[in-house]
A protein has these predicted regions:
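A fold-level detector for beta-propeller and closely related beta-sheet-rich head/sensor domains
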Residues: 1-141
Length: 141
């Protein structure tokens, strides 16, 4: 048994892009509120100058803050992103030193203190993202 990602002869995923999305579902009725392709092939081994694709394969989950921000890395392009929970608009992204195929966490040192979002940037061998061994913290404004 092999646990590998199946690629086409062009070394791309077999299904058409986008290959990964961040989707918000209204749990009261099951409808999709918004669906945004997650990541870009521009800085990955999938890059093709003739066709930059939004929505890379991804592995990792989001966190949601009380202020309505959705933080997720997961994509193959080594960015941690923040999205608006109501609209799906990408509000911010920060470059990671390696793949962020992990679920971020958030914390405060004091109840009235600054909030931080932290993610392990270790990469993922099967996805072909850059490997590393960093913990990266971003302070929320």
């Amino acid at each position: 048994m092999s646990r590998a990602i199946l690629h086409s002869p062009a070394n791309l995923p077999c299904n058409p892009p986008p290959w990964g999305s961040l989707v918000a579902v209204d749990v009261s009725n099951g409808s999709i509120r918004w669906n945004e392709p997650l990541g870009s092939t521009a800085e990955t081994w999938l890059a093709n100058p003739a066709a930059i694709v939004r929505g890379t394969p991804n592995l990792g989950g989001p966190i949601i803050t009380a202020g309505g921000l959705v933080f997720i890395a997961a994509a193959m392009d080594d960015y941690l992103r923040a999205f608006d929970i109501d609209t799906g608009a990408e509000l911010w992204k920060g470059k990671l030193p390696a793949g962020g195929q992990a679920t971020p966490m958030t914390y405060r040192l004091r109840p009235d203190g600054k909030q931080f979002v932290v993610i392990a940037a270790g990469g993922h061998g099967k996805l072909g993202t850059k490997l590393g061994d960093s913990l990266i913290a971003f302070a929320l404004p």
